Amino acid sequence: MRAEAGRSRWSTTRRGALFGGLCLCCLPTLGRSAEGFDLQEVGPGIFIRRGPDAEATPENNDAIANIGFIVGDRSVLVTESGGSLADGAWLRGEIRKRTDKPISHVVLTHVHPDHCFGAAAFAEDKPVYVGHHALRAALDARGEYYRGRLAEILGADRAGSVVYPTLEVTDGAEVDLGGRILRFTAHGAAHTNCDLSMRDAASGILFPADLLFVNRIPSLDGSLVGWLKEADRLRAMGATQAVPGHGPRLVDVAPALDDLTRYLTTLRDETRKAIAADVPIEKAVQTVGQSERDRWVLFDTYNGRNVTQAFKELEWE
């Protein structure tokens, strides 16, 4: 251990610790309005909307993640449900403009509200809600808090409600939409402790959700060391294209993962150096990772929080 008992260099984070790990880094906060939304077909039967690089506002309904759907011969799978009841309702309406096939599955990729609070909009379809085996506990711990924050920003009528997975993936799982198989992987602690990725067998496209950020700075709410391991796991899957959780609708996997791991490695290495040099966290949040500033949108909003999370993880290595 690098710190003596009863002594800590990150006293400014004590308030955060009292929340028992609640994700303050991904809670909606006020920001700029959303850009115009549209769905584009990025592969045969795969429709994706790009979310703006912004925070939740009353104007954008927390519609800030990349969401969409996949059409099989028999049914439709929702890749991400959206950031609010209003966002999910928008997506459901867009699906119905394109197909009358039943919506059989809705994927809940992780606990953060911009990815799962649209799920209630699909209730009347009675879909299977697919999620990581640890998602239920994460929603129990945070769901009502997130709902309350969304209600403050959007209003209770647009915020949505907590929806739990009905298919919990422990390791891997498959879903058949009729001539179209989706393969799921439950990951170890990384972006969160309940990250689920998916791959479309027909196109080979990977859906890593927030295990992959492009342009928008990654937000750390799980394990920094674990995220680097899971990034290697994503590489090993062999996909050449992916739909990231944030960023362009479709990206080349290799360079996108290179950018992600460069930032995470910088965060890890510079945090370790700060800890070894007894740098207080108040100073570390101002210096660690600054070489990455011009490479990421929302850097000033999230990098300091990432440094705080990294300190909490790495201080006791």
Per-region residue spans from a language model:
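Active-site neighborhood of phospho(di)ester-bond hydrolases with catalytic His/Asp-centered motifs
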Residues: 79-81, 105-110, 130-132, 207-209, ...
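Core dinuclear metal-dependent hydrolase active-site scaffold
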Residues: 168-200
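C-terminal segment of N-terminal export signals and the immediately downstream linker at the start
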Residues: 16, 29-50
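N-terminal secretory signal peptides and thylakoid transit peptides that target proteins
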Residues: 2-25
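Conserved beta-strand hairpin/beta-sheet module of binuclear metal-dependent hydrolase folds
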Residues: 41-94, 196-208
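Divalent-metal (often Zn2+) His-rich catalytic cores of metallo-beta-lactamase-fold enzymes
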Residues: 228-279, 287
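C-terminal regulatory/interaction regions
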Residues: 276-317
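Active-site HxH/HxHxD metal-binding segment of metal-dependent hydrolases
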Residues: 93-168, 174, 193, 269
